Amino acid sequence: MSWFSDHGVELKIEDDGRVFPVSNSSSSIIDCLMSQAMKIGVSLQTGKVVTTASASSLGKFLLKIEKRTIDYVEYVEADYLLIASGSSPQGYRLVAQLNHSIVDPVPSLFTFKIEDPKLAELAGVTFPKVKAKLKLENVRRNIPQLTQVGPMLVTHWGLSGPVVLRLSAWGARDLFSLGYEGILIVDFTPDLNMEDVKSILSQHKLQFVKQKVLNSCPSEFGLVKRFWKYILNRESLVEDMLWASISNNSLNSVASLLKHCSFRVTGKGQFKDEFVTAGGVPLSEISLNTMESKIHSHLYFAGEVLNVDGITGGYNFQNAWSGGYIAGTSIGELARVTDLEERVL
């Protein structure tokens, strides 16, 4: 973080620990990185693909490079090779060619598809703080991280926001095996216990007996009118009912729904909107202090090509940058020492 601040990109930390540029624009990060790369003479070649990679008996790496648009082939011999190809299938193919194993990649950090037409009508409604628990069939082990607290957003196809993205990250592999089906239980009043919610509803009923229930939602809940209407509809309460006509049983049912509102997850976001991938090169096959392969000397990995995936909020970027920094400095130091030794000889 200090590196970006020192290079002109101011950062901010959200209440839930997520880190973003103050500009709220990813281009601030991209422009900073590109600017620094150009300053130190990095050669950036685009429109090319490394199609094959092999290790020679002399400790070199033989690379076949092709252009995407024309019939062009180039062969390069490299002293060092750093694979930082993200979740690109081509990157995984290079990994396999170099005899590394791959943990099957699955999507992570995605939104939840909820087939609920009434919920879809609320697209754009945000909740600053909810407590959400993801229940997955046949997953009996206790996974504390499948309960998360944070902001949530209603979309045209379901639910999104930091709390949902974190749940998708912790449940990525189980969700994949279950066809992205499960039950999401949301507490819309996480700072109030059940008895508090019941008491607030009862007091509100006494205070606003002659008002329509739709037009008078307890302010303590912090809910927008559109969502309050959704809650009432789920409890089959007629919108023009007066508070005076609502039974205590109905009040208890509303309280239960606010504290334990269940949604059936039927898939992940419809636009292939996952941000990262879980899976990749096992960490057991690299030396984390240098990011060097344990199979081939002078072969390095960094970023999402490794079996590492973080929650939302900058953690995956940090993993890529930290791993890239370690790998780059390791290569630089090794090359410097090798150069000195060759000069001595």
Predicted regions span which residues?
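A conserved FAD-binding loop/helix module that cradles the flavin
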Residues: 80, 84-98, 307-339
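Extended, Lys/Arg-enriched charged tracts that mediate electrostatic binding to polyanionic substrates
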Residues: 117-140
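Residue-level recognition of phosphate/Mg2+-coordinating polar/acidic sites
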Residues: 1-2, 6-17, 64-66, 80, ...
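Short loop/edge segments at beta-strand edges and connector loops
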Residues: 44-48, 65, 104-106
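Short hydrophobic core segments
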Residues: 50, 74-87, 94-96, 152-155, ...
